[in-house]
């Protein structure tokens, strides 16, 4: 197993785990959903489904490259909720909230996650992508 596969499996397992948490502890995630989106429960469940699917894609070798692109896209799409949490000092379902430093660390980790996801997808900036998988 190479290092890229190891990162994909670990990242995929993390996405599946967090996705399952969206079903088992829905109330914990609901405060992060910006009110203008409507039903927080819907968005928590929907994002949980997507996180599980993306995680599975990262784990299965034949579609791992798609999982890399999907996880990068997911991390980009979910960041506005994290930004909402940061700007509005939102408390999670257990009453905890991140400090300014914690939110900054989260941003750096999210950017790193996007980079690793694109690396897993074997994406190279400026190169035409061929589906050789």
Question: Which residues does each PLM region occupy?
Answer:
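Membrane-interface extramembranous regions
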Residues: 1-133
């Amino acid at each position: 197993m190479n290092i890229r596969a190891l990162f994909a499996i670990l990242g995929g397992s993390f996405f599946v785990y967090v996705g399952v948490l969206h079903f088992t502890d829905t109330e914990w995630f609901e405060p992060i959903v910006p009110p203008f989106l409507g039903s927080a429960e819907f968005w928590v469940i929907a994002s949980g489904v997507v996180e599980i699917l993306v995680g599975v894609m990262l784990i299965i070798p034949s579609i791992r490259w798609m999982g890399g692109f999907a996880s990068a896209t997911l991390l980009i799409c979910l960041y506005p909720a994290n930004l909402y949490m940061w700007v509005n000092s939102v408390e999670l379902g257990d009453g905890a909230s991140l400090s300014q430093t914690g939110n900054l660390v989260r941003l750096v980790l999210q950017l790193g996650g996007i980079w690793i996801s694109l690396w897993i997808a074997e994406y190279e900036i400026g190169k035409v992508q061929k589906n050789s998988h």
